[in-house]
Amino acid sequence: MNSSGFMFNIDNGYLEGLCRGFKCGILKQADYLNLVQCETLEDLKLHLQGTDYGSFLANEPSPLSVSVIDDKLREKLVIEFQHMRNHAVEPLSNFLDFITYGYMIDNIILLITGTLHQRPISELIPKCHPLGSFEQMEAIHVASTPAELYNAVLVDTPLAPFFVDCISEQDLDEMNIEIIRNTLYKAYLEAFYNFCKNMGGATADVMCEILAFEADRRAIIITINSFGTELSKDDRAKLYPNCGKMYPDGLAALARADDYEQVKTVAEYYAEYAALFDGSGNNPGDKTLEDKFFEHEVKLDVYAFLQQFHFGVFYAYLKLKEQECRNIVWIAECVAQKHRAKIDNYIPIF
């Protein structure tokens, strides 16, 4: 072990070992082959008991529902993540906090949307992601105007730097809520990328690769989703995160694109993205571009575990488990609806 590894282990060795232990419990292909053969959700529960999920559904009464399975999967993952966060010291604690900011943005957008539509806060809070919860989250419901809402977000959340630089009070009233979400996410991704880059070493190597892909994926999806809408090319370009492999030339080309084929042409200049477009389609049996993006993300997250003494494993583990949760919920939906034709359309991890 080199000296940097020794120093890393003093503060972070236990948690990295714990995270790698959690990773060993991720479902293998053999587990999925068992799950897709289930006839009922009770069968599914039985098969999951034989994995690291154990008796996480033991206290749930029959008949089981997919939404209960979804909630319990998320609950288990949140407990694992929060356990690691509670035992972390700086700078790992800062890194883990950064991960939660993405969920916080989604929660803030949910609360802003609900507040502007006069929805009761008691109805909105349960829909928020627990990893993105923050102190005084319920205080936001006191805000009755966009200005009060804006100030509540600035005072009560760590997202203030992302808001101050790119969103004004007027924007909450006038700007499309999805534009606000993407503007915040651009600022967040760029800040997270710079944080990881400044850490240097294996953390920078692993995380900058993962976050660069996330930035490019968002730019591509924003472009495709903008076709046929009122969003101008200039406004669209302002939403692109500037920390991916497509920055700056690829993003400039994306900003000029008028249709899906032109986006595909831009992607062809980047080998890994060209492969994702080539392998996707909208015909029966084809994988969607979104599925191909998820597959590539899984590959990057699995690669993160090939190096030691870095923080990327914590991010990668969370993302792999989220994909696993989506897989289980997909299979559960197919079983519950007796719609087996597409039951194999999950994203394998190992």
From Swiss-Prot:
Quaternary structure and interacting proteins, as annotated: V-ATPase is a heteromultimeric enzyme made up of two complexes: the ATP-hydrolytic V1 complex and the proton translocation V0 complex. The V1 complex consists of three catalytic AB heterodimers that form a heterohexamer, three peripheral stalks each consisting of EG heterodimers, one central rotor including subunits D and F, and the regulatory subunits C and H. The proton translocation complex V0 consists of the proton transport subunit a, a ring of proteolipid subunits c9c'', rotary subunit d, subunits e and f, and the accessory subunits VhaAC45 and ATP6AP2.
GO cellular component, one term: vacuolar proton-transporting V-type ATPase complex
PANTHER family: VACUOLAR ATP SYNTHASE SUBUNIT AC39
One GO BP annotation of this record: proton transmembrane transport
A GO molecular function held by the record: proton-transporting ATPase activity, rotational mechanism
The entry's keywords: Hydrogen ion transport, Ion transport, Transport
InterPro entries (UniProt xref): ATPase_csu/dsu_sf, ATPase_V0-cplx_csu/dsu, ATPase_V0-cplx_dsu, V-type_ATPase_csu/dsu, V-type_ATPase_csu/dsu_dom_3
Source species taxonomy: Eukaryota, Metazoa, Ecdysozoa, Arthropoda, Hexapoda
Protein's name according to its UniProt entry: V-type proton ATPase subunit d 1
Functional summary from the UniProt entry: Subunit of the V0 complex of vacuolar(H+)-ATPase (V-ATPase), a multisubunit enzyme composed of a peripheral complex (V1) that hydrolyzes ATP and a membrane integral complex (V0) that translocates protons. V-ATPase is responsible for acidifying a variety of intracellular compartments in eukaryotic cells, thus providing most of the energy required for transport processes in the vacuolar system. May play a role in coupling of proton transport and ATP hydrolysis.
Family designation: Belongs to the V-ATPase V0D/AC39 subunit family.
Gene3D superfamilies (UniProt xref): ATP synthase (C/AC39) subunit, domain 3, V-type ATP synthase subunit C domain
